[in-house]
From Swiss-Prot:
One term of GO molecular function: nucleic acid binding
Pfam families: N6-adenineMlase (PF10237)
HAMAP family reported in the protein's UniProt record: Methyltr_EFM5
Keywords, ordered alphabetically: Acetylation, Cytoplasm, Methyltransferase, Phosphoprotein, Transferase
Name under which the protein is recorded: EEF1A lysine methyltransferase 1
Entry GO terms, CC: cytoplasm
Organism: Mus musculus
UniProt entry tagged with the keyword Methyltransferase: yes
Superkingdom assignment: Eukaryota
Chief site of localization: cytoplasm
Gene (UniProt): Eef1akmt1
Catalytic function, reaction form: L-lysyl-[protein] + 3 S-adenosyl-L-methionine = N(6),N(6),N(6)-trimethyl-L-lysyl-[protein] + 3 S-adenosyl-L-homocysteine + 3 H(+)
Length: 214
């Protein structure tokens, strides 16, 4: 990870960071979920060195429901660097929806053929089975709060989507997100399971339920 990338990682509050460091010092991370449990949000522990910060249960549920509504019946959904949303979608057992997780962390390969290894530094290096403009909705949460990361992730988003985009990133990225993807900030404010010092927001390029009251 470069020094600039380190600066762009969403920041934990000092109290949360201390607790998280203590947690990692005391426990080994292991991935051995089975059955339906493997779709529980948080079953795979955050690795904050990879800038992983999972959504709260309520936020993951709200975003998953929005994704289902936006994609429509039988819709195809791509979750780009947004594993919490993928897990909640699969936890909801919507078998009529096709959902894929695009993720750098190979621990998520437990999800079989729905896992697509993804490195935002190579935004278009995707398997041949992933066709251009083959997803009704792309949900994306770029790992770093930088123009470079958002720009490269945007290339992936534009390749994958048939039109609809749901982006989750820092409030400070609003202008760049609008320029790159034509998205607007929603009223809904996402929350993470661990408190972040950065303000996060959701953005869409369509009329979404995230502008309505919960």
């Amino acid at each position: 990870m470069s020094e600039s990338e380190d600066d762009d990682i969403p920041q934990l509050s000092s109290h949360t960071l201390a607790a998280l460091q203590e947690f990692y010092a005391e426990q080994k991370q292991s991935v051995n979920p089975r059955g339906d449990d493997k779709y529980n949000v948080g079953v795979i522990e955050e690795n904050w060195q990879l800038s992983q910060f999972w959504y709260s249960q309520d936020t993951a549920l709200r975003l998953a429901r929005e994704a289902i509504d936006a994609a429509g019946e039988g819709g195809r959904i791509a979750c780009v660097s947004a594993p919490s949303v993928y897990q909640k979608l699969r936890e909801l057992c919507r078998e009529d929806s096709s959902v894929y997780i695009f993720e750098y962390d190979r621990r998520f390969a437990i999800y079989g053929d729905e896992f697509i290894f993804y490195d935002y530094n190579h935004p278009l290096e995707l398997p041949e089975r992933i066709a251009a403009h083959s997803f009704d909705l792309v949900v994306a949460d770029p790992p770093y709060l930088s123009e470079e990361c958002l720009r490269k992730t945007s290339e992936t988003i534009q390749f994958l989507t048939r039109g609809k985009i749901l982006l989750c990133t820092g409030a400070i990225m609003e202008e760049q997100a609008a320029q790159l993807l034509g998205v607007k900030m929603c009223k809904f404010i996402p929350e993470h399971s661990r408190n972040l010092a950065n303000e996060f927001r959701c953005y869409t390029n369509y009329d979404s339920g995230l502008d309505c009251e919960a």
